[in-house]
């Protein structure tokens, strides 16, 4: 559906008020517009009243029936915000809705993975059917077909909900109750029903605990999970989340957007304002988190004196009591005492959206809480590679729930880091193979968290004189989740909550790094700095680097170019993927296959097997810039000296990978394992944009003892060239990680003056790299790389780059210290096509 059309439907524009261009896009057909109105309303589960669909579709009941059918067919979450209509009007409870969905997928013999993540989680909560139970049910269903008395899927499904968790602050509403229903109720149940019908909705905590569950199981009541404007929500590590698939419907997209944006110190109204999303939608999403048990309300949600005696020993109430400790509270309860509990806990869809409070008016309980509640944090940015390592390694029994939270929520907040660190501490080294790689990442992640979190040495000069300096809290943020927000929203979220961003290094090529001027970012300034282009930029400015050939998509090679003929191993990077080292002997077929899907960078890596790589951390200490060149004193290398003059390495951290292609180290080993882009010889050879062939992965021993390095033969400066420069804190090597963290503290990178210098140098580098990339685009004149372009040109180029890092329009070769256009001995695919036409 057209974005403009969606906008006008969302804002209830009738046909006669539509702009001419929108009418034209609909073929000037009012009937077409009305059809789009109904479709949009059903897809977004809009309420009939107060929306445009009311004026288009006259039959309200028919509309809700179609909405329910669409939701069920597309395996969407039950529309809890429409519970009053669904339960009272259509008599469809969440239990009957999910029973129908489960019956449909069983009859279609679909796998459990066909259920979207949140739908699967709600099915597990209400029906008690998870992956293993579903497989068991399908086996029973299939086996029954072989016998005379065949059981249908409906026969095998539960007839009533499993025991669900109900919080004391949830609101009990009367469902569709007939006289016959009342006859099968016990006396306490009848009294409860009478109270709800006569006095209106009741807090579940004010009724008998067992009666509430009994009435819910019978389908006589439904539950509202009320969220008010000033509610604050905490998201602990996920339990009971089902990782199946992402569907992409409106509500699921909203749930993921809010997941990564929410924090314990921002109330719902403020969050809606930051995200620029309708307040009622945000409340619906937060209500769903609480219903599924993925989040809980902070602060006083019910007066404990109002609790029915049957709730005293309920675990959720005991947890509630612990949250009422004033020292643990971050927000005051002022203003809530004058309202009745049910008014405070009014329906999530009907809460007044104009009751947003000024954050400045929200006083905290103590000065310590004030400091904690309003202190901006450091954000450590990671990608999905890290969560995969933590999930796949079976490193610690309870580590997986944290890893799932990091992946699905997209954030692990400072409040959860204590338990996360305890789990990381339990990780035991296996000492071999791929599992050792997972262990190394877990260990270095723990060290990095301990270094960045509440480290008073990092911010010694920025602390206020009248406040104790505890350093900054730390949140872990997944880049892919942040990129799910539009750039403006992402910027608002980051600016509101964080004082500094620090990236892991390297970030995978398969994502666009987060770009940020404020808060400052110790990491790639723009996506181009984390791409193939930056490699070529480094080679261009230093005049040094391995022989490299960047081929545009569609190019076809008849033979391997001459510059690679003497190499035994090549480093191959297909566009948007991480690199892999492959033998020269069988590379041509794979290259041509990859070139049909994407641009490819080919680089010489080793003349006698795999080349040797050494990672040189920066910023450089004074002692590292003195003395003679050796394997352990690479800071004096001429290329690094030039690089320090052209790129600000003193206010950023990271490492430069140096390559010795002629090295003949004896202690190499072959393995089918691989490391990430930080060590190209350990790089993953992921398939090339759908190609069935993937690059073979060959690895050398990741760590070479320093003494061994020094005695393994003489080396000269000429043997070594820069291969790659990565900004951020590396996680793939414990030794490198320790060195970089030490340098961050020693050079004061997180202090105010350094960050100010970083802002200027990052902008300058961004301008230079974008200008460099632009000079090799089709139709662009070759610009002087050494000139300083205007800031407006940066903006214009960045806007184009928002669609992705620009692809090469020309084939480029780096040879003998010079980067130039490559015509090649064999004609490109375009030229071949022209030859056939002649």
Swiss-Prot record:
One of its GO terms (biological process) is vesicle tethering to Golgi. The modification Phosphoserine is found at residues 332, 340, 671, 828. One of its GO terms (cellular component) is trans-Golgi network. It is found in: Golgi apparatus, trans-Golgi network; Cytoplasmic vesicle. Signal peptide: none annotated. Residues 334-367, 670-690 are annotated as: Disordered. Keywords: Cytoplasmic vesicle, Golgi apparatus, Phosphoprotein. The keyword Phosphoprotein applies. The keyword Phosphoprotein applies. Residues 340-367 have a biased composition (Polar residues). As component of the WDR11 complex acts together with TBC1D23 to facilitate the golgin-mediated capture of vesicles generated using AP-1. Component of the complex WDR11 composed of C17orf75, FAM91A1 and WDR11; FAM91A1 and WDR11 are required for proper location of the complex. Interacts with golgins GOLGA1 and GOLGA4 and with TBC1D23; interaction with golgins may be mediated by TBC1D23 and interaction with TBC1D23 recruits TBC1D23 to AP-1-derived vesicles. PANTHER family: PROTEIN FAM91A1. This is Protein FAM91A1. It comes from Homo sapiens. The gene is FAM91A1.
